[in-house]
């Protein structure tokens, strides 16, 4: 059976690189063939899975410079049938693509907001006067370059090769260790792996309510590798709390913790148990 993989397109995005890496891993380890299916937005990629049109989605969840990709967290929170199955981490490379002969000619730079943010210091240092225009992906802005010799795009060196656009500067990311976590999401129940992500809301904004919830894990010495909050989108000051922890939902300690947590939270959602793929 052929597996369909949704991701943020078009061709040349970092999400496509992650989808290809995952597809290659499936072929090498499970003899599973995959079809890559680009979508114009992360939301539409996840929606295609939730509606049963596509088998799985490969979506970015966190960048080492810019932090969480909040659209993914928000969709997982409000969509009941999506589950995280695997995680992979890839290094991210950003270059400046342009037909301009020099930096001095550039007046406009296109890229996805994450791409612009991950190169913010470089752009402020070398192109402080340019107009930054956000696009849906790091490759969408490339289509404007041939018609405008004063325009540039922040995208990957791989995209420069695919679209045959000159790479004016090969490496402009702010930090050399820039990398992004990607989640593999499907509608199948996920309870395998040694990592677990969940989210919860509290019944009321009372003193100590969050501490009480976190103490459930502390008492059992369960390691929380990440804690963050997102607006509930209901009213100002209401939040959803998101946690990554190490362990499996079937472990006795974690099972007890989740049972107790469900008793002191308004809504508790398990995004999934998953393993981290050894993809370099």
Show where each model-derived region lies.
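Domain-level signature for soluble enzymes in the chorismate/prephenate branch of the shikimate pathway
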Residues: 1-280
């Amino acid at each position: 059976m052929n597996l369909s993989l949704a991701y943020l397109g078009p061709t040349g995005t970092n999400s496509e690189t992650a989808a290809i890496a995952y597809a290659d891993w499936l072929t090498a380890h499970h003899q599973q063939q995959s079809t890559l299916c680009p979508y114009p937005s992360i939301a539409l990629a996840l929606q295609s899975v939730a509606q049963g049109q596509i088998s799985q989605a490969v979506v970015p969840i966190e960048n080492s410079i810019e932090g969480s990709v909040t659209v993914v967290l928000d969709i997982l929170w409000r969509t009941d049938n999506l589950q995280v199955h695997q995680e992979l981490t890839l290094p991210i490379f950003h270059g400046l693509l342009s037909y301009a002969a020099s930096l001095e000619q550039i007046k406009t730079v296109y890229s996805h907001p994450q791409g612009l943010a991950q190169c913010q210091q470089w752009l402020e240092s070398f192109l402080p006067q340019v107009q930054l225009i956000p696009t849906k992906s790091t490759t969408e802005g490339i289509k404007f370059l041939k018609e405008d010799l004063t325009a540039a795009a922040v995208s990957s060196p791989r995209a420069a090769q695919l679209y045959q656009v000159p790479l004016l500067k090969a490496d402009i990311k702010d930090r050399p260790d820039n990398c992004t976590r990607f989640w593999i999401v499907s509608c199948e129940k996920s309870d395998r792996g040694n990592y677990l992500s969940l989210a919860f809301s509290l019944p009321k904004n009372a003193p100590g309510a969050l501490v009480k919830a976190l103490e459930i894990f502390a008492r059992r010495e369960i390691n929380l590798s990440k804690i963050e909050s997102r607006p509930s989108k209901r009213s100002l000051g209401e939040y959803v709390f998101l946690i990554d922890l190490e362990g499996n939902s079937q472990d006795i300690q974690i099972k007890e913790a989740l049972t107790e947590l469900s008793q002191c939270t308004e809504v508790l959602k398990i995004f999934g148990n998953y393993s981290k793929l050894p993809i370099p």
